[in-house]
């Protein structure tokens, strides 16, 4: 192998940068350097990711993975990749690759030439830029480094400048190609028929030679028999001798052989006539073949002329486009000169304005710093105010709770005073009853009879004591019940206090959230004003999009307001579920914070996308846009024509196969019939000979005249049987 030539400096970074671009496709096989790409496996996987429909898995399975150092497998893989790329350009994109862009695969496989590999990778880049997923691939290119982006863009421009789009004159070329295809098909048919006729002539010549050999052998046998007849003429006078019998038998055989000879000569004449007809047909086919070859040469010449005219028309179109571009540039130059003069005048005005604006800017920066300090102080004061308001609310709630406790204590004090008074009255009554009972017990036993009425009167006093005791027990039970009820009431009051506390906290949080919403609205209004001021300076499209974003954010804020109002109504309606409402309010605040963060993130993303779009618009030339709608229609028509041509070719192939099968069947039938005729003739000859022998052996006592009559009858029967077999 020859040593590779030194590479130009412009070709080396192309291969390296395209390898970096290939690494963006996550392939199974490595693609770090030139040697890893020489097998063609990674390039095939990249093409499969670019267009799955065209470079399908069946196509990918043709490319062998286990290559090793076998350069033949590498070359076959690279040929398959290059063939797939050219067919994709020609059939799917409707473009022709110029010969300058086609790489030398032998240099890639043998020498690992990065220049030729760079050309092949450049064609893959063209497939990626012109496919259906081209926007994704362009975004991937924009994520690369600036130097790599520059090299990739130059490679794309090189491809665009050297691509040849198929012109509308391709219809006439298609018709000529169809005529050429038809002529070639007829030529192939004529050649096939010629070969068949040659084979048939050879077969007939072989048959003629065999028949001539048989004839010569029969003639020689005839001569031998004649000689024997001459020798045995004397012995034929006596019919009873064995020689006479043999003579008659040989004479019969001779007559049969003569008849067969006549029949073979007739068949020979037929074959000769048929052979002459076939030779005439062969001459006609040769003339037709010559005419078709001349037509094919004319079509090739016309095709070459069409290619030349197409190249000249492309050059003329390019020159016309360049002339129009130069005219537009001249007109733009005159306009630019006028604009330069006006801009120089306005530049002086702007210089004075900038000096004055810089002074104002210094003052504004100082004022802005003061404003920021004031804003921070205001925020600190707001936080302090919110904390103090919360503290005041809690203190007011505790004050209310203490007042309620004071009122309950006063009520309990009054109740205890009433209980004390009742207990004093009961105590006095018990003392009186006890004194009466002691006085009655100290009386004499003799006075019992006289004081029976008094004892009867004292009995109700005991009952009265029992009644008083029962009243006391009843009061004590009531006091116990009231104590249990008071404990329960205290528990309920504690629960109520907790709920009231939560209510106050929720009200304070609601008030603070309202203040926060007001602050957010003020901030949004300030942002709208600043955006309006910036919109007058920036472009119209970006400002309109930012306004749409702001309107969307405003709609979101209104939705949040509506949700807050609904939540307030729910708080007012469902006071016992204050804890759940507090959780919902905290969730809403978290959602608000998330929405604010999402809004900020969306604005930052939007700015990034705008900058990327501007960079892409600056880098890409607007003249290199995809083809117009008319070219797309022409491509569709060409695809439909190609489909029709494929269908017609398949039908033509099927018809040829059917004709060939019919011819084979006819020839086989003809050969089979000849074989059966030969077998029938041989069987009849054998049966006739055996019949003659039997007749001779069975009738030894016949006379000479009877024998002659019998021979003539057998001859007639044989002559009748032989033509019948021929007709069969």
From Swiss-Prot:
One of its GO terms (cellular component) is HOPS complex. Residues 12-128 form the Calponin-homology (CH) domain. GO terms for biological process: cytoplasmic microtubule organization; cytoskeleton-dependent intracellular transport; early endosome to late endosome transport; endosome organization; endosome to lysosome transport; Golgi organization; lysosome organization; manchette assembly. The modification N-acetylmethionine is found at residue 1. Transmembrane segments: none annotated. SUPFAM superfamilies: Hook domain. Residues 481-510 are annotated as: Disordered. CDD domains: HkD_Hook1. Residues 657-728 are annotated as: Sufficient for interaction with AKTIP and VPS18. Pfam families: HOOK (PF05622), HOOK_N (PF19047). Mainly expressed in testis. GO terms for molecular function: actin binding; microtubule binding; protein homodimerization activity. Keywords: Acetylation, Coiled coil, Cytoplasm, Cytoskeleton, Developmental protein, Differentiation, Microtubule, Phosphoprotein, Protein transport, Spermatogenesis, Transport. The modification Phosphoserine is found at residues 235, 719, 727. Residues 168-443, 477-658 form a coiled coil. Residues 1-555 are annotated as: Sufficient for interaction with microtubules. Self-associates. Component of the FTS/Hook/FHIP complex (FHF complex), composed of AKTIP/FTS, FHIP1B, and one or more members of the Hook family of proteins HOOK1, HOOK2, and HOOK3. Interacts directly with AKTIP/FTS, HOOK2 and HOOK3. Associates with several subunits of the homotypic vesicular sorting complex (the HOPS complex) including VPS16, VPS18, VPS39 and VPS41; these interactions may be indirect. Interacts with CCDC181. Interacts (via coiled-coil region) with RIMBP3 (via C-terminus). Interacts with LRGUK (via guanylate kinase-like domain). Interacts with microtubules. Belongs to the hook family. Component of the FTS/Hook/FHIP complex (FHF complex). The FHF complex may function to promote vesicle trafficking and/or fusion via the homotypic vesicular protein sorting complex (the HOPS complex). FHF complex promotes the distribution of AP-4 complex to the perinuclear area of the cell. Required for spermatid differentiation. Probably involved in the positioning of the microtubules of the manchette and the flagellum in relation to the membrane skeleton. It is linked to Defects in Hook1 are the cause of the azh (abnormal spermatozoon head shape) mutant phenotype, which induces spermatozoa with highly abnormal head morphology that differs drastically from the compact and hook-shaped head of the normal sperm, leading to a strong decrease of fertility. This is Protein Hook homolog 1. It comes from Mus musculus (Mouse). The gene is Hook1.
């Amino acid at each position: 192998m020859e040593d590779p030539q030194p590479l130009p400096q412009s070709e080396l970074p192309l291969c390296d940068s395209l390898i970096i671009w290939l690494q963006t496709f996550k392939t199974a096989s490595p693609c770090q350097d030139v040697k890893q790409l020489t097998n063609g496996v990674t390039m095939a996987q990249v093409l499969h990711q670019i267009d799955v429909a065209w470079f399908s898995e069946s196509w990918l399975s043709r490319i062998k993975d286990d290559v090793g150092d076998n350069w033949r497998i590498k070359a076959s893989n690279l040929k398959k990749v290059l063939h797939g790329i050219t067919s994709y350009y020609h059939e799917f994109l409707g473009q022709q690759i110029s010969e300058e862009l086609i790489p030398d695969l032998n240099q890639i496989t043998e020498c690992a030439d990065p220049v030729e590999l760079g050309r092949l990778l450049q064609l893959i880049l063209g497939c990626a830029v012109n496919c259906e997923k081209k926007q994704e691939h362009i975004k991937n290119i924009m994520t690369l480094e600036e130097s790599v982006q520059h090299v990739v863009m130059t490679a794309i421009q090189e491809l665009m400048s050297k691509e040849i789009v198929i012109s509308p004159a391709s219809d006439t070329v298609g018709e000529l190609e169809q005529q050429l295809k038809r002529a070639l098909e007829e030529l192939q048919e004529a050649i096939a028929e010629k070969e068949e006729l040659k084979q048939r002539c050879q077969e007939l010549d072989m048959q003629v030679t065999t028949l001539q050999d048989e004839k010569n052998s029969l003639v020689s046998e005839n001569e031998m028999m004649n000689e024997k007849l001459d020798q045995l003429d004397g012995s034929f006078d006596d019919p009873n001798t064995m020689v006479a019998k043999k003579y008659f038998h040989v004479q019969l055989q001779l007559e049969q052989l003569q008849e067969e000879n006549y029949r073979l000569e007739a068949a020979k004449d037929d074959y000769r006539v048929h052979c002459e007809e076939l030779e005439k047909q062969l001459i006609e086919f040769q003339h037709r073949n010559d005419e078709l070859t001349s037509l094919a040469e004319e079509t090739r010449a016309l095709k070459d002329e069409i290619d030349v005219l197409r190249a000249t028309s492309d050059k003329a179109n390019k020159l016309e486009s360049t002339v129009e571009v130069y005219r537009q540039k001249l007109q733009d130059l005159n306009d630019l000169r006028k604009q330069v003069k006006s801009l120089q005048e306005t530049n002086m005005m702007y210089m004075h304005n900038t000096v004055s604006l810089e002074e104002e800017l210094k003052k504004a920066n100082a004022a802005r710093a003061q404003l920021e300090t004031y804003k921070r102080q205001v925020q600190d004061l707001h936080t302090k105010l919110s904390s103090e308001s919360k503290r005041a609310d809690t203190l007011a709630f505790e004050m209310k709770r203490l007042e309620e406790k004071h009122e309950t204590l006063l009520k309990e004090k009054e109740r205890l005073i009433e209980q004390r008074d009742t207990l004093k009255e009961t105590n006095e009554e018990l003392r009186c009853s006890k004194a009466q009972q002691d006085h009655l017990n100290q009386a004499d036993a003799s006075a019992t009879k006289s004081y029976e009425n008094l004892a009867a009167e004292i009995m109700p006093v005991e009952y009265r004591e029992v009644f008083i005791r029962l009243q006391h027990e009843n009061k004590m039970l009531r006091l116990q019940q009231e104590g249990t009820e008071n404990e329960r009431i205290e528990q309920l009051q504690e629960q109520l206090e907790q709920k009231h506390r939560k209510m106050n906290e929720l009200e304070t949080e609601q008030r603070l959230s309202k203040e926060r919403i007001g602050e957010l609205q003020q901030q949004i209004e300030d942002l709208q004003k600043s955006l309006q001021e910036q919109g007058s300076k920036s472009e119209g499209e970006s400002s309109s999009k930012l306004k749409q974003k702001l309107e969307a954010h405003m709609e979101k804020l209104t939705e949040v307001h509506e949700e807050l109002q609904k939540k307030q109504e729910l708080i007012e309606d469902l006071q016992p579920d204050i804890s759940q409402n507090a959780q919902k309010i905290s969730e809403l605040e978290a959602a608000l914070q998330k929405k604010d963060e999402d809004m900020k993130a969306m604005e930052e993303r939007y700015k990034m996308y705008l900058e990327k779009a501007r960079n892409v618009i600056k880098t890409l030339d607007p003249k290199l846009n995809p083809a117009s709608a008319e070219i797309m229609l022409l491509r569709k028509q060409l695809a439909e024509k190609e489909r029709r041509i494929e269908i017609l070719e398949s039908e033509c192939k099927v018809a040829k196969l059917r004709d060939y099968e019919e011819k084979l069947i006819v020839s086989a039938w003809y050969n089979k019939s000849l074989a059966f005729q030969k077998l029938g003739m041989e069987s009849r000859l054998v049966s006739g000979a055996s019949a003659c022998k039997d007749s001779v052996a069975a009738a030894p006592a016949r006379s000479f005249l009877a024998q002659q009559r019998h021979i003539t009858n057998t001859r007639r029967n044989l002559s009748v049987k032989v033509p019948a077999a021929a007709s069969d």
